[in-house]
Amino acid sequence: MAFANLRKVLISDSLDPCCRKILQDGGLQVVEKQNLSKEELIAELQDCEGLIVRSATKVTSDIINAAEKLQVVGRAGTGVDNVDLEAATRKGILVMNTPNGNSLSAAELTCGMIMCLARQIPQAAASMKDGKWERKKFMGTELNGKVLGILGLGRIGREVATRMQSFGMKTIGYDPIISPEVSASFGVQQLPLEQIWPLCDFITVHTPLLPSTTGLLNDSTFAQCKKGVCVVNCARGGIVDEGALLRALQSGQCAGAALDVFTEEPPRDRALVNHENVISCPHLGASTKEAQSRCGEEIALQFVDMVKGKALAGVVNAQALASIFCPHTKPWVSLAKALGALMQAWAGSPKGAIQVVTQGSSLKNSGSCLAPAVIIGLLKDASQQSNVNLVNAMLLVKEAGLDVTTSHNPATPREQDFGECLLTVALAGAPYQAVGLVQGTKPVLQALNGAVFRPEVPLHPGQPLLMFRAQASNPAMLPTMIGLLAEAGVQLLSYQSSVVSDGETWHVMSISSLLPSLAPWKPHVTEAFQFCF
């Protein structure tokens, strides 16, 4: 999945010129058009495989479903809440961002907001412009010794922590993913949220906008906070409940707030913006020359590396895909697709649980990318799932009535000596199991239901294979099968058979084209199927 057919990219928001240049130097056509309406954006995307946006363009499900050629959406920045991830994933469209591009700029703005809240700098400056000299009105507070609560300890959160520690602030925080040991390494003590609220003099949020983070600061949590707490939101509008914040400001429970983001941008309700203890900016978190250049450069390089098959970085909705660009993994992905297609042809649109088992040290962490490849083989022939790919496979397989489990078996000492790795695909509770491996860079089939092929059967993309099981004691069987091929006008290209298992043998014929029907074969064999992947 090297996205080799991605040729044209639309940039629909203002980006640094380096973005266009890098894309063009990488062999891609680039169109730059900003401030497009929904209808105009859909029209422009009809001949584009790629789209790069900042935060202004809203990539909705309507746009995604109408953009027939679209394969990749790139967000030059961190947050992707302006992209409908579910719709993109369902359609098999990759979504990527630049998680590092604006981290420093967002962190520096947050630190500036904290300092402005402590010393009321914007209010004092505005007073001076009005010709006033109000020294007593703008009495501030030192940051030294104050407690800063940081909710979200990713890249931006930790940059804020290290900077504010230099002011003598004590930093505490919460993050459901970052471990306490990791956060302690950059000076943040993690505590449960209910313990954080009453301790903080300042609270800053650095989380994505999710159902679990929407309204994270609300009437209930403000009531638990220390009276006079100051709040900063340079992350996403909606994390702080704006109605609750206004009530806390009016009651004095919250002494001040600094907001760079809002639930609605620009906000039509000006009550918060106009409050004397609120500092507000028009979403400037990433608005520095350095961040814009960095984000534009990073997303362009990610597109070019992806198209050339070098690497896949910044993936939001299919992280496991990054490993398919590893030279070791590519042939295993091809093998997984082949075994999935084999299983679909053999079991006849199976239902239930599909088991994907890896074996061998080099495949220890490969199940997450091989399972979607197996699903592609399983679902590709189903007309309603013809668009299945590595992005949407795990979503579509559930709708097809299948559960997919992955597991790993460590290699035995003997297998470790020989470096043998295996991929097994099986249908739980049914007699369908296929085992394959990679020889050099070539996928091969090793066994079906324990019947081993020696030598293994090559699995070439686009090469039809006919497989059937029959009694090993029937010497007339093979001439009969060859005769049936001739009657159908199909050439036999190669032939292999397995060792005898339970008195029967599996036979594999590489043929020039798929047979129109297997009905003539059924009286002569125990079972038969054909497939091509």
Curated annotation (Swiss-Prot):
Residues where N-acetylalanine is found: 2
Cross-link (Glycyl lysine isopeptide (Lys-Gly) (interchain with G-Cter in SUMO1)): 21
Entry-annotated residues carrying Phosphoserine: 14
Active site feature: 236, 265, 283
In-chain residues carrying the UniProt-annotated modification N6-acetyllysine: 21, 58
EC assignment: 1.1.1.95, 1.1.1.399, 1.1.1.37
Chain residue numbers at which the record places covalent cross-link Glycyl lysine isopeptide (Lys-Gly) (interchain with G-Cter in SUMO2): 21
Binding-site list for NAD(+): 78, 155-156, 175, 207, 234-236, 260, 283-286
GO molecular function: L-malate dehydrogenase (NAD+) activity; NAD binding; phosphoglycerate dehydrogenase activity
Disulphide bridges: none
Substrates-to-products reaction catalysed: (2R)-3-phosphoglycerate + NAD(+) = 3-phosphooxypyruvate + NADH + H(+); (R)-2-hydroxyglutarate + NAD(+) = 2-oxoglutarate + NADH + H(+); (S)-malate + NAD(+) = oxaloacetate + NADH + H(+)
PTM-bearing positions, type Phosphothreonine: 78
Stored InterPro entries: ASB_dom_sf (IPR029009), D-isomer_2_OHA_DH_cat_dom (IPR006139), D-isomer_DH_CS (IPR029753), D-isomer_DH_CS1 (IPR029752), D-isomer_DH_NAD-bd (IPR006140), NAD(P)-bd_dom_sf (IPR036291), PGDH (IPR006236), PGDH_ASB_dom (IPR045626)
UniProt entry tagged with the keyword NAD: yes
Function according to Swiss-Prot or TrEMBL: Catalyzes the reversible oxidation of 3-phospho-D-glycerate to 3-phosphonooxypyruvate, the first step of the phosphorylated L-serine biosynthesis pathway. Also catalyzes the reversible oxidation of 2-hydroxyglutarate to 2-oxoglutarate and the reversible oxidation of (S)-malate to oxaloacetate.
PANTHER family cross-referenced by the UniProt entry: D-3-PHOSPHOGLYCERATE DEHYDROGENASE, FORMATE DEHYDROGENASE 1
Record-stated family: Belongs to the D-isomer specific 2-hydroxyacid dehydrogenase family.
Name of the protein: D-3-phosphoglycerate dehydrogenase
